[in-house]
Amino acid sequence: MAFLKKSLFLVLFLGLVSLSICEQEKREEENQEEDEENEAASEEKRGLMSSIGKALGGLIVDVLKPKTPAS
């Protein structure tokens, strides 16, 4: 009977350890996916801000450019 108890405890312990490892790997994968999504969103924002900056810069240059009188 004691042998069966020890075997059962061993099986339960190994099952819990493997379950814990699987959950940890799953969390790591989810964190990697979130990081990739955040990185992609950050790149989109940088691209948008860059294009807006270029457009506004060109507009400001055109507005501040001295106008020559037409002859």
UniProtKB/Swiss-Prot annotation:
Taxonomic classification: Eukaryota, Metazoa, Chordata, Craniata, Vertebrata
Tissue-level expression: Expressed by the skin dorsal glands.
Region (Disordered): 26-46
Protein name, as recorded: Aurein-5.2
Pfam family, one: FSAP_sig_propep
Keyword terms: Amphibian defense peptide, Antibiotic, Antimicrobial, Membrane, Secreted, Signal, Target cell membrane, Target membrane
UniProt signal peptide: 1-22
Localisation: Secreted; Target cell membrane
Secreted among keywords: yes
GO CC annotation terms, alphabetical: extracellular region; membrane; other organism cell membrane
Organism: Ranoidea aurea
Cited InterPro entries: Frog_antimicrobial_propeptide, Frog_Litoria, FSAP
Family label: Belongs to the frog skin active peptide (FSAP) family. Aurein subfamily.
Disulfide bonds: none
One of the protein's GO biological processes: defense response to bacterium
The protein's role, per its UniProt record: Amphipathic alpha-helical antimicrobial peptide with moderate activity against Gram-positive bacteria (MIC=100 ug/mL against L.lactis and MIC=50 ug/mL against S.uberis). Has no activity against Gram-negative bacteria.
Propeptide: 23-46
Biased composition annotated in UniProt, kind: Acidic residues: 30-41
